Amino acid sequence: MEDLKKSVTNIVHSMYNFDCSEIVSLTRPPKPEYGDWALSLPLKLASLLKSPAIDIAQSIASALLELDGVQDVYVAKPGFINLKLSREHTTGIISEVLEQGSSFGRNTTQSSKKINLEFVSGNPTGPLHLAHTRWAAVGDSIARILINCGADVTREYYINNVGNQIHLFSESVYARALSKSLPKDGYPGEYVKDIARRIQCEFPNIIDLSYEDAIKIFRKRSWQIQIEEIKKSCIAFRVNFDVWFSEESLHEPDRFGKSQIDKALARCKQNGYLFQKNGAFFIRTTEFGDDKDRAVLRSDTSYTYYAADCAYYLNKINRGFSDLVILVGADHHGYVKRFQAMSNIFHVDSENNRKNVQVLLGQMVSLKNKRQSKREGNVIGLSEIIQSVGVDPLRFWFCRYPIDTPIDLDEQHLKKRSNDNPVYYVQYAYARTRSLIRSANLLQMEKFGFFPELLVHETETALVSLLYDYKTVVIDAARFLQPHRVVRYLESLAGAYHKWYDKCRIIPRKGILDKSEAELVNTRLELNRAVGQVLYNALDLIGVSAPERM
């Protein structure tokens, strides 16, 4: 489809000297008899070119008829174009899939980008919870899709190891080591006791130290041990971060006594966006749509979180990233304007160097029939939910929905081995393709050749059309940072495959009777192989396994 879109773009440019690349789109007609693709572009061009849509449609249609692979073009009022591709062109996708194998679907649409993708970034004060699990699945899948489209992607985890929560966490661990009650608003949970025991094993005499000396050790080791556990959980969930960035490093002075935060605020001052009010310092973020100017230095000379955010942003820019993508919870909606403000403030002298900053706001996740409370210490952690449900169902389910859609997770449903469980339905389709291939290998069917013109059943036409769609689905998923497009495609392809499997006997029960039947069987087996390959490739984009047997 992308090649066809490029052809349409070139036709319009040559006819009208107009670049329509941003508005051209191809869709599937509501009925197969209307053709393979529908184009509503003339309706959009009519007002732009000051010409009747039907006339534009007729002109474009005439040029489309000259393209290789286009069998017929129909124009309908007020300015729609329907295209029918030749049988050879559409079924050619089967050979393309089989020739390219695991590379099918890869492209270079994002090759000009060096992207920093920050996600999860849960505070190192406890295990990752359900919402973090969602960000892990979605963030890693976005990375996989972008890499598939040629981008240079760095997966990054920001460790919030500075501030009151870290202090309270270390105090909680220290209290558990002394078998004392928790401080006010302290952290409950068995994991706090586990960390306390581990620190005591590392430093056997720590409880004999003064509070001042002991708390220094607890402050450092508590979050470090928790991060070690978080790393293990992420790896078990098939998420591997390239960079674990410590917020603490932003506060550390260089040999001249200046921290990265100091340098970032100096840059803000140099560009005219830093001002003082009531003894504190603020950045003029309201000039870029924020609801209020953000404090960066309090009157007691301590830095705010936004000061560290500014330094972290500048750190990413200095590492050469062209695009910054940040996944946060919906409760961080204010981050959008703040990060956009940074992009303007730090690049005021150069419009061309302004960075593309995208903040993706994700809705929360609830667990059906289970109440969770972090303060009560009964939050469901990533490791626990993996043990209960498994990696594949979780990753599939979390990527199945747009990130701004709340999810109510049903553990029992995800454990079902039935067709009403989407991940089982898709994986079972792949396992079926592999089972047929094993059976075909015993029959040595390859010698009978491949004749795509034999694929005339309506279920085969539907399958071929879906194979044809795959590359565009991947390109759009990367462009819009939406893994759910891949998941929904997988469900459509699996559904079409199961329907084909049930309607068409691929390998006859009574054996192959003659040469013509053998040719049809082998041709269908090639379609089967192509579907299996695309299922495998798409599952890999969301980090879900493709089982050989089920």
UniProtKB/Swiss-Prot annotation:
Its EC number is 6.1.1.19. GO terms for cellular component: cytoplasm. GO terms for biological process: arginyl-tRNA aminoacylation. Transmembrane segments: none annotated. It catalyses: tRNA(Arg) + L-arginine + ATP = L-arginyl-tRNA(Arg) + AMP + diphosphate. It is found in: Cytoplasm. Belongs to the class-I aminoacyl-tRNA synthetase family. This is Arginine--tRNA ligase. It comes from Tropheryma whipplei (strain TW08/27). The gene is argS.
